[in-house]
Every structure is written in C-alpha cells, then in structure tokens.
C-alpha cells in the first residue's frame, strides 16, 4: 500500500509538472527568445493580413508559386494537421502522387516527368509546411513569369532575394517561404 501511495504521488507530481509548469516554461522561453515571441508571423500586403508565414497555404493560380501539397484536410486545415501515414507501397498514396505529378506537368509542360521535384507532389509530415526548396521555386519560375507577363530573369531575381539561409549558417537547409515569395511578387507588380 505504501508503494502504491508513493507511485500515485509521483504520478500526480509529474502530471502537474508536465501539464502546467513545463508548458509554462516553454511558453516563457518562446516569449523571450523565440522569433515573434512564439506567436504567428503575420504576413501583410497593402496593410491587410493575408496569412501567417509559418503555416502553409494553398495557392493554385499560375500567377503564384505553389507550396507542397497538404494532407491536412481540405487545403491546409490546421485543425487536421498530420501526415497521411500512407507509405510508398499504399496504392491509394501512389495514385495521389501520380495525379499530383500529372497536374504539375499540365501547368509545367516544359518539364519532363523525371524533373518534377518529389517535394512538390508529396505532403510534409505536418501537412502545413510553408517552405519549399530553392529548386522547387526555380522549377516554377517559367510558369509564374508567363502568367504574370514578366521575364524569367525578373521572377528569378525575386526568388533569389527570397531564399532564406540555414540558421546560423549550419542548421537546416536553404528554403523559400511560399507566402513571402508570393507577397514579394505582388509588391513587384506595382
């Protein structure tokens, strides 16, 4: 009985610690050291909020760069954030990827099937990834330039300016935030 009581006390102490104090400590750390104080990075265009730069959004028009597909509900639903849990041997998953490749090629007829970046047809683990690699952005330059009536060089220059380097030059890889890139495109068209 003594052991059971000790175990219950320890369990209760850990429950309180991890459900209250641990979360509070992380929140305080984010408020002090985190980017944007641990809050969403709100993106604006012409003074209007157009989204959060740290959550992916669906772009389907040819005048915009596209992000990765989302497995989070219909169109980047943050309440459904999760991976699809479908593996490369799942026929339904393979059919989805094939359909995404076909759609991508319809909008990028200058590409060969083998040149479609895998990341543009597969969802990220959260289904809400706001970033793509520079390669994925460069693959879309021609389509976006044609749709906007700009030269490829103009659009490529905007992509070049939008590339974010790895944290401290070491952690992670180069990336392009799709929402920020599309905002930069809109601002350049003025």
Language model regions located:
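Flexible, solvent-exposed loop/hinge segments and secondary-structure transition points
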Residues: 6, 19, 26-147, 163-166
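Aromatic-residue-lined binding/catalytic grooves and analogous aromatic/hydrophobic interfacial grooves
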Residues: 3-18
């Amino acid at each position: 009985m003594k052991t059971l009581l000790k175990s219950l006390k320890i369990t209760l102490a850990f429950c309180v610690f991890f459900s209250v104090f641990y979360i509070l400590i992380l929140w305080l750390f984010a408020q002090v050291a985190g980017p944007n104080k641990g809050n969403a990075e709100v993106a604006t265009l012409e003074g209007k909020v157009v989204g959060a730069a740290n959550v992916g959004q669906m772009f389907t028009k040819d005048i915009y760069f596209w992000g990765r597909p989302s497995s989070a509900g219909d169109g980047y639903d943050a309440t459904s954030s999760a991976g699809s849990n479908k593996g490369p041997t799942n026929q339904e998953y393979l059919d989805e990827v094939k359909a995404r490749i076909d759609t991508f090629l319809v909008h990028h007829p200058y590409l060969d099937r083998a040149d479609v970046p895998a990341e543009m047809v597969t969802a990220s683990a959260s289904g809400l990834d706001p970033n793509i690699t520079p390669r994925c952005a460069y693959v879309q330059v021609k389509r976006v330039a044609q749709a906007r009536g700009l030269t490829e060089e103009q659009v490529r220059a905007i992509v070049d300016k939008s590339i974010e380097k790895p944290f401290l030059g070491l952690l992670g890889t180069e990336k392009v935030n799709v929402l920020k890139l599309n905002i930069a495109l809109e601002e350049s068209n003025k």
